[in-house]
């Protein structure tokens, strides 16, 4: 490992004895994929289905439903918070320019959809006079122009920049649907206010081009601003180059674990596909896809319709609940690892299960177990061989690395002497003792579970002279 800047560097040593590690995970889930609306390449924290609907809309009309279905399954399986990042390829932005009230009218205000996409073409706006003279009201409609389609109303707006009710400032801060731009009309006073209009549609929005690995790579890179460790899923995405881009991002950060959706095909086909993915301990595949009752049906519609979704989002929700109830040391698998909302899956034979589990790129099976329901019965990463082939081992190592890095930040630029070594020893030992006591490390005593060495033997003078402490 090269040491090129001041900081804390943690090196892993995978010993033959397998640790059980983990507790109170710092992980947060992240979904990256296509959506009708929402900010592009901007990880957006959502803590409920309703909040997702507010920020990204409900079921998609112009792109696939992989992301909204993933969000729905995540929260249905106990997930509490996640980042959603929309990816898109050059989508068009819906806009409408409004003229002012002068006799020689000129453009005064542009109303644009909050973000690009064809969804913005479903917006309409109306401008009316406010109760107070010299101000105007703005009404935003979505999906129609009746009172039931009103989604936002803004009253007593002004086009005077010095006014406390200046329209762009007041609307852009709070609106989930539109942004306003002052077009700097050459007219003055209240004549700069937009003229009264009724149900004017926005236009120009488009889905854009087909999304490729380029857009996914940009969406992944946007998570560099998220400092927490991530459980990452690309809802519905099984393309080799895209999944491998996610694995590459995880390996570059070393605190990201990728949950990969299995393909909607036979176990043999899944084994071929998994073998094409990068053999990394930072990723795991879950198969087969899940059949669920279609949640996109309108209230009162005929029930019983089902659809198929990737397993990754439900597994991400399960990982979140397992982390909170047990810790990262516990594999998100077993008879208690029930996936909610599942009505059926492809049935796997014992021979299928054997091949999935023993393959060079193992696949974690989801099975129906009488008395337990549809449960995850696998905890293997895509890396075969060493002990980090197990999901809880790799995620525990991520947790330990990040925790120890955070806990020892105080050591940067401290005098590298016995006093610092004692502080580091005490800090790390205290953390690992607590970690062990909660079930994260094997051993009946702390000394059997771990050791901490910070002394003159592993800190010789030549390393001290280089500014390192080990």
Outline where the language-model segments fall.
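Long, low-complexity, polar/charged, intrinsically disordered or flexibly structured peripheral segments
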Residues: 188-211, 216
């Amino acid at each position: 490992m090269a040491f090129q800047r001041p900081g804390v560097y943690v090196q892993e040593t995978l010993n033959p004895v397998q640790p059980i590690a983990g507790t109170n995970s710092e992980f947060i889930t992240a979904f990256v994929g296509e959506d009708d609306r929402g900010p592009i390449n901007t990880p957006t924290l959502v803590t409920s289905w309703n909040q997702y609907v507010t920020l990204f809309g409900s079921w998609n009309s112009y792109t696939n439903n992989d992301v909204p279905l993933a969000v729905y399954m995540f929260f249905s399986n106990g997930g509490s918070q996640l980042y959603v990042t929309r990816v898109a390829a050059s989508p068009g932005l819906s806009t409408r320019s409004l003229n002012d009230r002068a006799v020689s009218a000129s453009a005064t205000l542009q109303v644009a959809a909050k973000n690009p996409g064809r969804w913005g073409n479903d917006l309409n706006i109306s401008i009316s006079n406010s109760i107070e003279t010299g101000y105007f009201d703005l009404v935003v409609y979505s999906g129609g122009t009746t009172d039931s389609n009103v989604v936002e109303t803004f009253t007593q707006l002004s086009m005077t920049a010095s006014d406390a009710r200046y329209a762009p400032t007041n609307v852009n801060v709070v609106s989930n649907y539109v942004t306003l731009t002052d077009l700097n009309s050459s007219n003055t006073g209240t004549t700069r206010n937009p003229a009264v209009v009724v149900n004017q549609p926005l236009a120009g929005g488009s889905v854009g081009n087909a999304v490729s690995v380029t857009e996914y790579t940009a969406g992944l890179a946007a998570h560099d601003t998220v400092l927490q460790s991530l459980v990452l899923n690309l809802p519905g995405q099984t393309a080799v180059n895209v999944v491998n881009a996610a694995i590459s991002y995880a390996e570059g950060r070393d605190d990201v674990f990728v949950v990969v959706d299995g393909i909607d095909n036979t176990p043999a086909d899944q084994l071929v596909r998994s073998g094409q993915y990068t053999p990394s301990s930072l990723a795991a595949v879950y198969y087969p896809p899940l059949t669920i009752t279609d949640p996109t049906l309108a209230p009162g519609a005929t029930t019983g319709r089902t659809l198929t979704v990737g397993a990754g989002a439900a597994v991400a929700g399960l990982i979140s609940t397992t982390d909170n109830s047990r810790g990262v040391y516990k594999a998100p698998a077993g008879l208690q690892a029930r996936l909610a909302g599942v009505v059926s899956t492809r049935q796997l034979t014992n021979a299928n299960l054997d091949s999935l589990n023993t393959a060079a790129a193992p696949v974690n099976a989801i099975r129906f177990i009488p008395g337990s329901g549809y449960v995850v019965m696998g905890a293997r990463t895509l890396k075969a061989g060493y002990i980090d082939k197990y999901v809880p081992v790799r995620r525990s190592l991520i947790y330990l690395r990040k925790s120890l890095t955070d806990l020892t930040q105080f050591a940067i630029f401290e005098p590298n002497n016995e006093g610092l070594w004692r502080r580091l020893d005490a800090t790390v030992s205290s953390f690992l003792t607590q970690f062990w006591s909660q079930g994260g490390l094997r051993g009946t005593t702390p000394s059997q579970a771990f050791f901490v060495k910070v002394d003159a033997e592993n800190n010789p003078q030549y390393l001290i002279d280089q500014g390192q402490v080990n």
